[in-house]
Amino acid sequence: MAKLHDYYKSSVVAELTKEFSYTSVMQVPRVEKITLNMGVGEAINDKKLLENAAADMAIISGQKPLITKARKSVAGFKIREGYPIGCKVTLRGERMWEFLERLISIALPRVRDFRGVSAKSFDGRGNYSMGVREQIIFPEIDYDKVDRVRGLDITITTSANTDAEGRALLAAFNFPIP
């Protein structure tokens, strides 16, 4: 079991129950899933770019990504419906906790000029979305084997009802929100 999951069960639940005066342990917000998304618009011309992006995503997440396809044709972007244009991974359970632990303790501190993540990125329902400009902040990615620096979107979905509850949950994990 991941250390962060143990920490959540042992101290975060009690801390949040006291802070928000929940009557039941089941009311305490929890992390439900983490979704990683990498849009590779250049994959229209070169299929190898999408394969490399999917390989990077598999290394970062520990599971095989789903190739996302264009929902509709857009002439301005030169894409047709059904073209593969990105990849995504949904992490749940142990892999989710391990990824969150690596993100907080290893990956985010490796970002250049890092001053914390934006507090405005909550969606109103306690979920948090952020973008990472470089996939090389993850220690699993070998810098010498990277063909191109790509960014990815990370969405942390929680069972919190409000942004305040979601912020308190992530702050309890020492998530760097100012």
Swiss-Prot record:
Entry's Gene Ontology molecular function annotations: rRNA binding; structural constituent of ribosome; tRNA binding
GO biological process: translation
UniProt xrefs under PROSITE patterns: RIBOSOMAL_L5
GO cellular component terms given for this protein: ribonucleoprotein complex; ribosome
Keyword entries, A-Z: Ribonucleoprotein, Ribosomal protein, RNA-binding, rRNA-binding, tRNA-binding
Superkingdom of origin: Bacteria
Described function: This is one of the proteins that bind and probably mediate the attachment of the 5S RNA into the large ribosomal subunit, where it forms part of the central protuberance. In the 70S ribosome it contacts protein S13 of the 30S subunit (bridge B1b), connecting the 2 subunits; this bridge is implicated in subunit movement. Contacts the P site tRNA; the 5S rRNA and some of its associated proteins might help stabilize positioning of ribosome-bound tRNAs.
NCBIfam families attached to this UniProt entry: PRK00010.1
Recorded family membership: Belongs to the universal ribosomal protein uL5 family.
Oligomer and partners: Part of the 50S ribosomal subunit; part of the 5S rRNA/L5/L18/L25 subcomplex. Contacts the 5S rRNA and the P site tRNA. Forms a bridge to the 30S subunit in the 70S ribosome.
UniProt-recorded name of the protein: Large ribosomal subunit protein uL5
Gene transcribed to yield this protein: rplE
